[in-house]
């Protein structure tokens, strides 16, 4: 649940009961129980679906909003022998989205006209590996930066523009700037 709430991409691989035992109660079925707190949750009972389901899982891990993925595999499948043609796994591509140019222009106009702007950087900046770009932008524009707890290391805390971390708790400086800011990016 925490990984889902924090948009953390992790792959969970729990074992499952043999298919013949899955209909008996009480049986914990992870793929069913975790469906609402994962991006993708599935069970593999047939070796012929193994490659396809792993491709689907890794596509979910690589694309869109980050989050946990679960593939539950029946124990007999893990212990069995593969019969038939060796599957050809192809890693799915990572698709990147791009901000709309019109939206970027409007945000930039609002930022340029702001008198007391502030940046809140989250873990998306970490996943994008944009720490250098963030620092360069903040320094060039002279905009103070606070980070979310998950994005804490994206901006140096000893930097003169650093306001510290904000989340359920917030530093006094970040709270002051957030209350006084006329534009938060």
Residue ranges of model-derived segments:
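N-terminal alpha/beta PP-like core and its mobile active-site loop of ThDP/TPP-dependent enzymes
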Residues: 1-185
């Amino acid at each position: 649940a925490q990984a889902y709430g924090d948009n953390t991409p992790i792959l969970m691989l729990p074992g499952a009961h043999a298919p013949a035992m899955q209909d008996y109660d009480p049986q914990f079925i992870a793929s069913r129980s975790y469906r609402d707190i994962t991006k993708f949750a599935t069970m593999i009972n047939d070796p012929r679906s193994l490659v396809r389901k792993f491709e689907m899982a890794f596509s979910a891990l690589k694309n869109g909003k980050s989050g946990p993925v679960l593939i539950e595999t029946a124990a007999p499948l893990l212990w069995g022998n593969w019969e038939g043609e060796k599957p050809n796994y192809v890693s799915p591509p990572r698709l990147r989205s791009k901000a709309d140019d019109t939206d970027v222009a409007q945000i930039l106009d609002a930022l340029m006209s702001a008198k007391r702007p502030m940046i809140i950087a989250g873990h998306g900046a970490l996943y994008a590996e944009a720490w250098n770009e963030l620092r360069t932008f903040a320094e060039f524009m002279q905009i103070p930066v606070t980070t979310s707890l998950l994005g804490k290391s994206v901006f140096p805390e000893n930097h003169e523009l650093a306001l510290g971390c904000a989340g359920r708790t917030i530093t006094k400086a970040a709270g002051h700037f957030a209350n006084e800011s006329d534009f938060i990016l």
